Amino acid sequence: MKFFKYILTLLVVFLISGYFLLQNHSVQNRLFENTVRALFQTDEIFMNDALSVAVCGSRAPLPSPNRAETCLLVQAGTSKFIIDTGRGSADNLQRWRVDYSDLEAVILSHLHSDHISDLHEVQFQSWLGGRKTPLSVIGPIGTASTAQGFEQAFKLDSIYRSEHHGAILPIEAYGYDVVEFEGDAKLIFENEDTRIIAFKVDHSPVDPSYAFKIEYKDRSIVVSGDTVSLDVMVEYSKGVDVLFHDALAKPLIQEMEKISEEIGNNIVSKVLFDIQDYHANTVEVADIARRAEVDLLVFYHLIPAPRNYISEQMFLRGVDEIFTNYHVSEDGTLVSLPAGSDEILIDLID
């Protein structure tokens, strides 16, 4: 009993001392200084000499806590790309303190809002991060007019900020430098070690819509964008290290559709019915991975994103019978493929 009282007394003294210590201005300043240093310092999240992908947005438009809409941050050696910029993804990039100095381009798969909503935020963050020329954007036909719309919407904002901050935000660096592509397949980027091929997929009525094959030295990935199940996905994914594929979980969506109809929310019920015909479902995606003999399948653009154990089990219903080496992504999932190796490393960015 005496020992318990002694420990309790020490705890009370410690808490009181800590409280008064935190009222000290010097202590407050030091703690805040440490926070600010961590906030403003760029952080390197990628391995050297590797093909790496960080999932900066893992969900579809259906809301889910702690998840942004579709976005992948790709590092191929010393070159960086952002594939799609859905709502909330720029916040993740900012929170991870991404260094934009080696950003080659933003690449857009198609022009649905959940793939482009944060394009301006990425443009602004990289401008604030020291970019000296307009942001390079590569995308399908229609990308130029979309970028022009963003540029016009924030034109006055850019002028105000440039006039206020001067040379650190040169007005000539504001905006977008757009390259559009078309056709069934197109080489959209190439340097000594890296190739990116865009190939057409089916997300009708969205047309065009593209997937991407990215090769860095001896490593490779395919990113589906949004598509139904297609043989062309198998063709381009044949033997790649990792396939990142959008996926719709029919057991979840059909249950949500039924409940929406029962409670009289006919608009939501209709939308949930409609989306089932232009996304591959989880079982179909697993079959694509099996037929292509990929080493790892990563589900992203999750429709809907699982929120708990039960919904994840429903999301994956039928998948294990077809393909077992898969990973259900979350915001911060990091997949690294070191060059000259067969390793596939999976981590989570804090």
Residue ranges and their predicted role:
Residues K2-G18, A211, S220-V222, V228-D331:
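Cap/insert and terminal regions of metallo-dependent hydrolase folds
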Residues K2-V228, S311-D342, D347:
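Binuclear metal-dependent hydrolase catalytic cores
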